[in-house]
UniProtKB/Swiss-Prot annotation:
This is Protein GET1. GO terms for molecular function: protein-membrane adaptor activity. It is found in: Endoplasmic reticulum membrane. Required for the post-translational delivery of tail-anchored (TA) proteins to the endoplasmic reticulum. Acts as a membrane receptor for soluble GET3, which recognizes and selectively binds the transmembrane domain of TA proteins in the cytosol. GO terms for biological process: tail-anchored membrane protein insertion into ER membrane. Its main location: endoplasmic reticulum. The gene is GET1. Residues 1-4, 132-155 are lumenal. It comes from the Eukaryota. One of its GO terms (cellular component) is GET complex.
């Protein structure tokens, strides 16, 4: 059985990812993966994608065909486009209904597996110490805060451990984001900086001459 410390950390990490990416984005990705599997909606989703490409291609051909110069070809393309569009709208409407039900089920399961599980763990292990602090290291009021709400005095409660994990994950994410920005940022060429400085100096000089006049 995995350690409770690790379970709480993984749970906070998943919550951070969901909050950063967004619940709607997670739902959309899961819907795409669901349609990649042999599910009841996979064939309809593939057909909808095929029709979507066909509609785009027909639109391009319609735009490149003159209705005055080649009316028969234009009319044929227009009929094909309307037929494909009607079929696509029918399939898309059915898929949207399935997606709404899928999103509702996924949202419920996601809440139960993250927030719901966190509440259950905090309630069930409220009196269980995550780990003990060395005796005499901290003042009484600090030990009381670390053991809040019902853990033994001198230990760290599951609530405090969860807050600590969430804070560490957030700080680590901000640090990685800052490193990524610094690593991918292109340095400004020195020649460009000199040109900008000269242009700024020239502007200041011209404005000073205007004031004297």
């Amino acid at each position: 059985m995995p350690s409770l410390l690790l379970v709480v950390f993984i749970l906070q990490f998943l919550l951070h990812i969901i909050n950063t990416v967004g619940a709607s984005t997670v739902n959309d990705l899961l819907w795409i993966l669901y349609n990649k599997l042999p599910t009841p909606t996979s064939s309809s989703a593939q057909k909808a994608q095929k029709l979507k490409k066909e509609i785009v291609q027909l639109k391009r051909e319609l735009g490149a065909t003159s209705a005055q110069d080649n009316f028969s070809k234009w009319a044929k393309l227009d009929r094909q486009h309307n037929k494909a569009m009607a079929e696509f709208q029918k399939i898309d409407g059915s898929l949207r209904g399935h997606q709404t039900a899928f999103t509702s089920a996924v949202s419920t399961l996601r809440w139960l597996g993250t927030q719901g599980l966190r509440f259950v763990l905090q309630f069930w292990f409220a009196k269980s110490p995550m780990f003990w602090m060395p005796a005499g290291w901290l003042p009484f009021y600090v030990e009381w805060i670390l053991s809040f709400p019902r853990a033994p005095l001198g230990s760290v409660s599951i609530n405090v451990w969860g807050i600590a994990c969430a804070s560490m994950i957030a700080l680590a994410a901000e640090g990685l984001a800052a490193v990524w920005v610094l690593a991918t940022k292109r340095p400004t060429p020195i020649a460009t900086e000199k040109k900008e400085a000269m242009a700024f100096a020239a502007d200041q000089k011209s404005s000073g001459e205007k004031k004297e006049l």
